[in-house]
UniProtKB/Swiss-Prot annotation:
<dbReference type="GO" id="GO:0015757">
    <property type="term" value="P:galactose transmembrane transport"/>
</dbReference>
<feature type="topological domain" description="Cytoplasmic">
    <location>
        <begin position="188"/>
        <end position="233"/>
    </location>
</feature>
<dbReference type="GO" id="GO:0048471">
    <property type="term" value="C:perinuclear region of cytoplasm"/>
</dbReference>
<dbReference type="InterPro" id="IPR003663">
    <property type="entry name" value="Sugar/inositol_transpt"/>
</dbReference>
<dbReference type="GO" id="GO:1902730">
    <property type="term" value="P:positive regulation of proteoglycan biosynthetic process"/>
</dbReference>
<keyword id="KW-0225">Disease variant</keyword>
<dbReference type="GO" id="GO:0045454">
    <property type="term" value="P:cell redox homeostasis"/>
</dbReference>
<feature type="topological domain" description="Extracellular">
    <location>
        <begin position="99"/>
        <end position="106"/>
    </location>
</feature>
<feature type="glycosylation site" description="N-linked (GlcNAc...) asparagine">
    <location>
        <position position="334"/>
    </location>
</feature>
<feature type="binding site">
    <location>
        <position position="432"/>
    </location>
    <ligand>
        <name>D-glucose</name>
    </ligand>
</feature>
<feature type="topological domain" description="Cytoplasmic">
    <location>
        <begin position="436"/>
        <end position="445"/>
    </location>
</feature>
<feature type="binding site">
    <location>
        <begin position="242"/>
        <end position="243"/>
    </location>
    <ligand>
        <name>D-glucose</name>
    </ligand>
</feature>
<dbReference type="GO" id="GO:0070837">
    <property type="term" value="P:dehydroascorbic acid transport"/>
</dbReference>
<keyword id="KW-0762">Sugar transport</keyword>
<dbReference type="GO" id="GO:0005351">
    <property type="term" value="F:carbohydrate:proton symporter activity"/>
</dbReference>
<keyword id="KW-0812">Transmembrane</keyword>
<comment type="function">
    <text>Facilitative glucose transporter required for the development of the cardiovascular system.</text>
</comment>
């Protein structure tokens, strides 16, 4: 179409490098925390505060980032976030005290949160319907690659003097490369000019921009106008079920489950990190290949169903199988949890939690017990704090034979792998893809950021409520409750989330405008021959 720069490869590099930066920054603390503890004499509380400072910065970005994205443009937001990330990385690399480390981590958290929102929106608007699913999902693949890359660099730099400074500094490399890629892509300050440049890529007609285009305020997200309330319901439902299915806490026990099947000591942590990382990469690549063929709705339904089965399986197994102890709070954290950020990776959600009160069921439920630790530690809801938990359980009646225990432990490991895979081709990439599609361009940044803030809040709520929930109903019933929540999420997706594959952003917007509230049953064809799944409950006024 006369474009000299290779637009699709550049879009792919923007998405991949953005995700790689995101994943690297999330995971790098796992290797840097132990040398930081030794160099600065950090207590458990100080370690948690350092790790949690990233969350504070990301939360701030989710609150104000949408306005920045809509006011200054997607491309400018990405470039600005990369500059902020460079400043944060420089602060971390030169830090001489805990205060500077916390400041640097908070700045980095702000940068990666803003970049994640802007990248998903920018790429979704830049490419056509046939490429949108693959290229936006590439961000999730970049996250998993970035996490694995951070593990490799952490290992290589672990024994070097001031190695943690280099660990933080290497995050600037993908950010610089992403900025260079953006220089050859259309700008976003002039909305009309930008969209005219994008028409050959979208393969459709130019949208009517200018005075005739509707203007939206933030409060319109909660009004019936153009079915904005229905769109917000879909967006919030997806991000909330993404977290309320319990994946921030289930993956805390990855290293424990690996240890229970015979991988003890350091090998347990390595396998929990690298092994699950490899599983996530494979599942994300599968999602990339299917998202524009099978569709967003199909992947969400399949992923949520498998998550419900697998987390329920872990809960049932934990009734009978005692788990081995985990690391102490001063050990290098095993980064195998989930942050709940866009493109959510599922590898960074270890929790640092205090002792859990025993249940009133005479130990009939598996419960958590804290490993030995050097200092008392207050409760923390930080989703990436260093772990120091162990699983223990006891069942009344005769113990299972050793062979039975082994079978159940391997079953728990299989369920964990299925859970990670299901999240990685379902909620992980598809949630953010759908959010980047369903809102009008004029308010897309603010709407995306609004939903993202609820994702962070739900992640924090799940982490904070975990102890009380286990103390009340026990570990096994907690996992079974997560399974029930996944079943409810399955129903929500089936009823409310339409299929958007193969449709331009303008067509998706028009479909939402025609209905105040929709339920999705089966598949049918619209007048343009593009399949989507919904039935009309009430016509728009």
């Amino acid at each position: 179409m006369g474009h000299s720069p290779p637009v699709l490869p550049l879009c792919a590099s923007v998405s991949l490098l953005g995700g790689l930066t995101f994943g690297y920054e999330l995971a790098v603390i796992s290797g840097a925390l132990l040398p930081l503890q030794l160099d600065f004499g950090l207590s458990c509380l100080e370690q948690e505060f350092l790790v949690g400072s990233l969350l504070l910065g990301a939360l701030l970005a989710s609150l104000v980032g949408g306005f920045l994205i809509d006011c200054y443009g997607r491309k400018q937001a990405i470039l600005g976030s990369n500059l902020v990330l460079l400043a944060g990385s420089l602060t971390l690399g030169l830090a001489g005290s805990l205060a500077w480390l916390v400041l640097g981590r908070a700045v980095v958290g702000f940068a990666i949160s803003l970049s994640s929102m802007a990248c998903c929106i920018y790429v979704s608007e830049l490419v056509g319907p046939r490429q949108r699913g693959v290229l936006v999902s590439l961000y999730e693949a970049g996250i998993t690659v970035g996490i694995l890359l951070s593990y490799a660099l952490n290992y290589a730099l672990a024994g070097t003097p001031w190695g943690w400074r280099h660990m933080f500094g290497w995050a600037t490399a993908p950010a610089v490369l992403q900025s260079l890629s953006l220089l050859f892509l259309p700008a976003g300050t002039d909305e009309t000019a930008t969209h005219k440049d994008l028409i050959p890529l979208q393969g459709g007609e130019a949208p009517k921009l200018g005075p005739g285009r509707p203007r939206y305020s933030f409060l319109d997200l909660f009004r019936a106008r153009d079915n904005m309330r229905g769109r917000t319901t879909v967006g919030l439902g997806l991000v909330l079920f993404q977290q309320l299915t319990g994946q921030p806490n289930v993956l805390c026990y990855a290293s424990t489950i690996f240890s229970s099947v015979g991988f003890h000591g350091g090998s347990s942590a390595v396998l929990a990190s690298v092994g699950l990382g490899a599983v996530k990469v494979a599942a994300t690549l599968t999602a990339m290949g299917l998202v524009d063929r099978a569709g967003r709705r199909a992947l969400l339904l399949a992923g949520c169903a498998l998550m419900a089965l697998s987390v329920s399986g872990i809960g049932l197994v934990s009734f009978a199988v005692p788990m081995d102890s985990g690391p102490s709070c001063l050990a290098v954290p095993n980064a195998t949890g989930q942050t709940g950020l866009p493109g959510d990776s599922g590898l960074l959600q270890d929790s640092s939690l205090p002792p859990i009160p025993r249940t009133n069921e005479d130990q009939r439920e598996p419960i958590l017990s804290t490993a030995k630790k050097t200092k008392p530690h207050p409760r923390s809801g930080d989703p990436s704090a260093p772990p120091r938990l162990a699983l223990s359980s006891a069942l009344p009646g005769p113990p299972l034979p050793a062979r039975g225990h082994a079978l159940l432990r391997w079953t728990a490991l299989l369920c964990l792998m299925v859970f990670v895979s299901a999240f990685s081709f379902g909620f992980g990439p598809v949630t953010w893809l759908v959010l980047s599609e369903i809102y009008p361009v004029e308010i897309r940044g603010r709407a995306f950021a609004f939903c993202n803030s609820f994702n962070w809040a739900a992640n924090l709520f799940i982490s904070l409520s975990f102890l009380d929930l286990i103390g009340t109903i026990g570990l096994s019933w907690t996992f079974l409750l997560y399974g029930l929540t996944a079943v409810l999420g399955l129903g929500f997706i089936y009823l409310f989330v339409p299929e958007t594959k193969g449709q331009s952003l303008a067509e998706i917007d028009q479909q939402f405008q025609k209905r105040r509230f929709t339920l999705s049953f089966g598949h049918r064809q619209n007048s343009t021959g593009i399949p989507y799944s919904r039935i009309e409950i009430s016509a728009a006024s």
